Amino acid sequence: MIIFAIESSHDDTSFALLDDNKPIWMKTITQTEIHKQYGGTVPEIASRLHVKNIGILIEDIKSQININKIDLIAYTKEPGLVGSLHVGYVVAQSLALILNKKIVGLNHLEGHFYSAFIGKEVIYPALGLLVSGGHSQLVLYNSKDDFKIIGQTQDDAVGEVYDKVARKLNLGFPGGPLIDQIWKNNHKLYTAHLTIPKTEGFFDFSFSGIKTNVINLINNCASRNEQINVNQIATEFQNTIVEYLKEHMETAIKKFSPKCIVLAGGVSANFAIREMFYSLHKNVFLPDLEYTTDNAMMIARLAYEKFRYNN
């Protein structure tokens, strides 16, 4: 079964082909450099660029496969930027009508979970940690159709906090890779972490308090005319994030006894978080780095998981 997938929920335009869980081809056009000058994604600009980039990708895919051989067309239906999602939907719907193929709209967040299983089989029950710029969730998967969000952020997403802290430290955008690189160079020197937040929900997150702690540290240094130690603040910020996620995962593993644990989402590319994750369980699934950010292959993999049992 050959699945063609489209991902356009945010600022990446991505096409992919998957044949029975074997990746055939993927191409993603990112808009990061364009949005960097604005300090974040501008929805209207993102939509316009999706229209332009999809035209390029359509020409590319025609050179990869006889499109009549496609069995299923999948696209990201939700969540995401409304305009960006609509561009992907229109293209998917048009191709489905032209080729007379089945079409399925899928959830972007579910796709991230299955990004760790591209070319692999899922082991249920699985405990997934989704960490990205827009979402932070703990999800327990008992099967492809039986899953429950057992915890989620009550305020900022973890990737969002990385961007805000990086901006306050004048590091640039996106903040995650920049802070992670500082951590790699300094974590043996700076081992402390900030206060770990507490939430009413046992498995919920609250990242805004960590962000506020960092901002207060910076503002206090500035008010005293002290030099801001960017390396120390960035490193101890990441130490805090890693410890916070680790505490939640350890508690959830003890309570639910999953057969495997899964890390997914854009922040899953973070070196420190990946290293921590491997220490938690004997069966650990992480996406390859090319599949950590938004991509169509994860949507194709989700479609394969859903559709192969319902054919």
Curated annotation (Swiss-Prot):
Entry EC number(s): 2.3.1.234
Binding site for substrate: L130, V131, S132, G133, G134, D163, G176, D180, N270
First-listed, main subcellular location of the protein, grouped into a coarse class: cytoplasm
CC annotations in GO: cytoplasm
InterPro entries: ATPase_NBD (IPR043129), Gcp-like_dom (IPR000905), KAE1/TsaD (IPR017861), TsaD (IPR022450)
GO BP annotations, alphabetical order: tRNA threonylcarbamoyladenosine modification
Cofactor: Fe(2+)
Cofactor comment: Binds 1 Fe(2+) ion per subunit.
GO terms of molecular function: iron ion binding; N(6)-L-threonylcarbamoyladenine synthase activity
Binding site for Fe cation: H108, H112, D294
Keywords for this protein: Acyltransferase, Cytoplasm, Iron, Metal-binding, Transferase, tRNA processing
A Pfam family recorded for this sequence: TsaD
Reactions performed catalytically: L-threonylcarbamoyladenylate + adenosine(37) in tRNA = N(6)-L-threonylcarbamoyladenosine(37) in tRNA + AMP + H(+)
Subcellular location: Cytoplasm
Enzyme class per UniProt: transferase
Record's function text: Required for the formation of a threonylcarbamoyl group on adenosine at position 37 (t(6)A37) in tRNAs that read codons beginning with adenine. Is involved in the transfer of the threonylcarbamoyl moiety of threonylcarbamoyl-AMP (TC-AMP) to the N6 group of A37, together with TsaE and TsaB. TsaD likely plays a direct catalytic role in this reaction.
Entry similarity comment: Belongs to the KAE1 / TsaD family.
Protein name: tRNA N6-adenosine threonylcarbamoyltransferase
Organism: Metamycoplasma arthritidis (strain 158L3-1)
